[in-house]
Amino acid sequence: MGLLKAVVVLNGAADVKGVVQFTQEGDGPTTVTGKISGLSPGLHGFHVHALGDTTNGCMSTGPHFNPLGKEHGAPTDDNRHAGDLGNVTVGTDGTVEFSITDSQIPLSGPHSIVGRAVVVHADPDDLGKGGHELSKSTGNAGGRLACGVVGLQG
């Protein structure tokens, strides 16, 4: 299958913007690298959502991508949504550069994330362990600050 590449351009609330790149070699894990700016310092939930629909901004991207019907969790948990990528840690300058490697977000096949949305949230993802009523579905990560649709690159 060779190397697959995809990209998301994030846009949203106020000055939040960024670019996230995805690469996958064969059936191996997907590497996610990105830079996002315009965020408040601290942790922000970072997820793949089920739909690539941004007609109503980030609100129309649906729930977390969850093809296997599991509960929300941390990226290292066995019981997690495929789209649960945890948090990105934003510095005092409002920017974050990150690299994540994950085996549940392929760029091809029946569970491909191509055509789905990536969303950056206002608050930290509690990784399903916060005890809040939303912990097991969204990680209680709050509002959707920015989003974009995953598209294949040549």
Curated annotation (Swiss-Prot):
GO terms for cellular component: cytoplasm. Cu cation binds at H47, H49, H64, H121. InterPro entries: SOD-like_Cu/Zn_dom_sf, SOD_Cu/Zn_/chaperone, SOD_Cu/Zn_BS, SOD_Cu_Zn_dom. Binds 1 copper ion per subunit. The keyword Protein biosynthesis does not apply. Its main location: cytoplasm. It is found in: Cytoplasm. Keywords: Antioxidant, Copper, Cytoplasm, Disulfide bond, Metal-binding, Oxidoreductase, Zinc. Coiled coil: none annotated. Belongs to the Cu-Zn superoxide dismutase family. Homodimer. This is Superoxide dismutase [Cu-Zn]. It comes from Pinus sylvestris. The lineage of its organism: Eukaryota, Viridiplantae, Streptophyta, Embryophyta, Tracheophyta.
